[in-house]
Amino acid sequence: MSMKGKETMSKQNEKLVVGKLGSSYGIRGWLKVFSYTDNPESIFDYSPWYIDQKGEWVEYKVEGWKRHNKGWVVKLQGLDVREDAHLLTNFEIAIDPASLPELSEDEFYWRELFGMQVVTTNGYDLGVVTDMMETGSNDVLVVKANLKDAFGQKERLIPFLEEQVIKVVDRQAQRIEVDWDPAF
């Protein structure tokens, strides 16, 4: 099993947030880009982009992009002057989740795991996946424990380690089976 993508899910109109626009660059409407994808350059593989403006997703087409110092800059269609680009500084970039590539059966996007029930191999209900963390060595499930958890836990951090900890991920049943001590 492997995890693909650090993308975070935005529930509004089923868009998937994959990055953020930074400050304007130059005088011709370019903007700096901060990518949340595993491979930062892959953010440019998706088009169109959607920018949340006053609660509405506004569609933008990527006209061009290039490497700049240690990051990236992008030119969005319709933004031709610095002042227009500046208005989008710090706005999140989203895409249509349907544009994501299909994964193999043993690969998952983080967003697929959110809301899944987590149970031990002995059947103890640990709670529900509410978030994911990247630690560098492996991804970590953030599991909100049930209100009346027998071990007094409110939240559990469970490493997403195939075979060692994660035994089964059942997309159909929305359930993850883990080899994990409920006291942790």
UniProtKB/Swiss-Prot annotation:
It is found in: Cytoplasm. It comes from the Bacteria. GO terms for cellular component: cytoplasm; ribosome. Keywords: Chaperone, Cytoplasm, Ribosome biogenesis, rRNA processing. Residues 105-184 form the PRC barrel domain. InterPro entries: PRC-brl_dom (IPR027275), PRC_barrel-like_sf (IPR011033), RimM (IPR011961), RimM_N (IPR002676), RimM_N_sf (IPR036976), Transl_B-barrel_sf (IPR009000). One of its GO terms (molecular function) is ribosome binding. Binds ribosomal protein uS19. An accessory protein needed during the final step in the assembly of 30S ribosomal subunit, possibly for assembly of the head region. Essential for efficient processing of 16S rRNA. May be needed both before and after RbfA during the maturation of 16S rRNA. It has affinity for free ribosomal 30S subunits but not for 70S ribosomes. Belongs to the RimM family. This is Ribosome maturation factor RimM. It comes from Vibrio cholerae serotype O1 (strain ATCC 39541 / Classical Ogawa 395 / O395).
